[in-house]
Design a protein with these regions (language model features):
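Hydrophobic alpha-helical segments and helix pairs
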Residues: 1-34
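Transmembrane beta-strands of outer-membrane beta-barrel pores
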Residues: 12-20, 33, 46-52, 68, ...
Length: 152
């Protein structure tokens, strides 16, 4: 929510969970920045996080988001990183209190290349999901993905 010109706004978020992930309600300030042409965008949110049905429901979360378009828009590097406190147990019964998750993405924007139709809004790329102690997992996980996306 932003009703003023300053780069700081109010951020309200709901994360709905299924089964082993509890519902969470988040609120806090957000700082957002962008270059004049929006080729570079950055945001950070520092939030209070209430997690339903958790033994310790009062927590925090820090989130960073970014988008960088470069080489005349041919390539995009974007993603987010979250760090939060949440008491939980992994599949082996080990207790964890902090979680880190990031999902950087790299895209090749085909319609920005010579001899490619400008209406072909197709990008090919990859996302790398990396997390530590997320959900019922113990330790660090890396899940690479190949992807295609259409930009409307």
């Amino acid at each position: 929510l932003k009703f003023w010109k300053a780069p700081v706004s109010a951020h309200i978020e709901y994360n709905g969970g299924l089964n082993y992930i509890n519902n969470a309600f988040l609120a806090g300030p957000a700082y957002n920045w962008n270059s004049a042409d929006f080729s570079r965008v950055f945001g950070v949110q520092v939030m209070y996080k209430y997690i339903q049905k958790n033994d310790e429901p009062h927590n925090f979360q820090v989130t960073g988001t970014w988008t960088i378009n470069f080489c005349q828009g041919k390539y995009t590097f974007s993603g987010f990183a979250d760090f939060w406190r949440e008491k939980h147990f992994d599949v082996h019964g080990n207790e964890h209190n902090y979680i880190f998750m990031t999902e950087p993405q790299f895209w090749v924007n085909l319609n920005q290349f010579k001899h490619v139709n400008k209406d072909l809004n197709l990008s090919v790329g990859t996302e790398w999901e990396m997390s530590t102690n997320f959900a019922t997992r113990n330790g660090f996980y890396y899940i690479p993905t190949l992807a295609m996306k259409w930009t409307f």
